[in-house]
Structure formats: structure tokens, C-alpha cells
Amino acid sequence: MTTVSTTADAPAAASAAAPYLSVNNIEVIYDHVILVLKGVSLEVPEGAVVALLGANGAGKSTTLKSISNLLRAERGDVTKGTIEFRGKRVDRLTTNELVRMGVCQVMEGRHCFAHLTVEENLMTGAYTSRASRSEIRADLERVYHYFPRLRQRRASLAGYTSGGEQQMTAVGRALMARPSMILLDEPSMGLAPQIVEEIFEIVRDLNTKERVSFLLAEQNTTVALRFADYGYILENGRVVMDGKASELAQNEDVKEFYLGLSTAGRKSFRDSKHYRRRKRWLA
């Protein structure tokens, strides 16, 4: 298996501190039959941006839902392994309990309430908050500071806003819960490149200024590795490679199979021989 570093070395590479979030050898089964994750392990240090990369169907979204405990709504279950946040087991907590601990997920597809205004959507993120009204208004102003476009669209029905504005609304809604860890699923999906850059710049600002940690699942490997500190690559429900984002971006296998580049120049996925990749990585 080609690696940049081993998973066990990941905390040392990204941070000397103990991992903020630790996923340890988890297996996930849907409908008591379909094995989707096959021993996935990863770590997110406090204050880091970690990218979870891979093709569609590799297991990225399932990994995030395992952490946020949204699997049960889809008849899925973690049947092996543990998940720890701040040193405590969280794999059997409810989603509400995880939100109160500081873990929020922004799901793939944005999932805004189309019949509510942008501001009403944002306010739903404060539903579990024990903050006072003045504190909630301050949180709302903080969201508008990072997403000034949402201030302009605050009275518009979310269903009539653009895909980029809906993605911003979904992230802003998560911020209203005052998270210390955000699980961000496919933030670039269906968005124009300029909007993708804008959203990732905001993720960077939230990370550097607010110390919010991010675990983001993303198919856009090029953008994700530019903004992340560390990365894991999933293939068929397994972690096949991990390392510092800067090192992954220079790895020849990653260049060929995920960035569309090789020593011969840019290549398409159609031209790549995927069976060789699987044989090399999963042997």
C-alpha cells in the first residue's frame, strides 16, 4: 500500500496535542447486511482542518454520519470500533447530545428549510442553545460578519436563494449552535468555482479566528488539499492513504488518480487504470 505516512503517525504530523476527535477502527453496516466502512481510523487535532477525500461511494459521508450519529435514521449502525471526542466515548450519544458537546454536521445537499427565511433558518441552529436572547442575537451578528451576503438576503425565503447562499446558510446555522467541531459534507457540490473558493476561505477564517476544528468530506481534492492541514483518502470503505495535505498534493498516486495529473501531464479518470490502483493500495 502506498502511503505518505501511517495513520498512527497522523497526530504527531498535525499536532503534538492529543486528538480532539478520534475514530478508531470503526465498521459500519447498513440494513444488517451491507458492510460500508471496513476498519476506518482517523484523528482530528484541536484547531485543525482535516480533509476526508475519495471518490463517490468511498464512504466519506458514512464516516461523518457515524461521528454525528445520523446513521440510525438511514438504518445504519457502527458495529465495531469506537469514536471519542475530547477523550470521551460518543458513539452511542444522540445527535442532540453531540450538538451540546460542540459537534455539528452540515449535511451534503445543504437541507435548508425552503419555506423559512434565511434568518429563520439560521435561528433554528440556536434551538438547543441555552444562551440568552442577547447572546443569540450576538451569535447571529457573528454569522452575518462571516457571511455578509446572508445579511442582505436575511428576509428572503431560503428556497429562492442560490446554491451558494444555501450552503452559507447551512454553515451559518451550524455556527449558531456554537460548535467547536464542524463536520462538513461535500461543501463544493453543485457550486461554481468562485463560490467554492469563497466558502473555503470562510472555513479558513473560522478555523484561524474562531479555532473551530473541521472534518470535511470532499470530492474536490485540489481545493480541499489547498485549505486543509491533513488529509485521509478513502477507497471502498478503507483508509488507503493519509498525510499532511501539502505532501498528499505532491504524491504521484494522488496526482494521477485524484488530481488528474501524472508525469505525462493531465489525465482523465477514463484513461486511468483503476484496477492497478486498487491492487496497489488494497493488497
Task: Locate predicted features.
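A short, proline-enriched helix->beta-strand linker immediately N-terminal to the Walker B motif
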Residues: 176-180
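Conserved ABC ATPase signature
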Residues: 157-161, 165
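The feature captures the beta-strand-to-loop junction immediately N-terminal to the Walker
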Residues: 53-55
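ABC ATPase nucleotide-binding domains
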Residues: 260-283
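Conserved ABC transporter NBD signature motif
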Residues: 78-88, 135-140
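ABC ATPase signature
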Residues: 116, 160-161, 174-175
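Helical segment within the ABC ATPase nucleotide-binding domain
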Residues: 197-211
